[in-house]
Amino acid sequence: LCVIAIHLIYDLGFFIGLDLHLPAWYVFIQQYGGVIFVILSGCCATLGSRSFRRGCIVFACGLLISLVTFGMYRLGMASRDVIVWFGVLHLLGVCMMLYPVYRRLPTPALAAIGIILVVAGYLIAGTVVRAKFLFPLGLLYEGFTSSDYFPLLPHLGWYMLGTVLGRTVY
């Protein structure tokens, strides 16, 4: 529901031009909602099966979003920065596909790896490299834009910490 509320308020401001005084909860959800969503997704990974298969489907949906937004740009319906290069669906798809690889790790080891990935992600944030193919990891090239961007570092770490939470709570 928070995602719907955030997008509704954004759309009202963007398309209709309403100047809304944003409540504190909106700012909090806007800034931290993505991380909360990824953690909850990791938590849910511990409850289901066929994670790799579901990950392929989610990743394919992310690719479809990329294709549609790229088409909008190429047809002149939107600017280049509307293209989604590695959004939340790409991220969650990759995380789900990787879950079977580390599922059997002990919970403390998984927590340690998750923390390391989160810290590494924040340490490399904003790093500019020449290689254009490294953006899914969080290493950006000059001029990179994406309307939805969730790099693997730090978000794979947040997903792993979500699986730790899922194991602990459930």
For each feature predicted by the language model, list its residue ranges.
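Alpha-helical transmembrane segments and their immediate juxtamembrane cytosolic regions
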Residues: 1-170
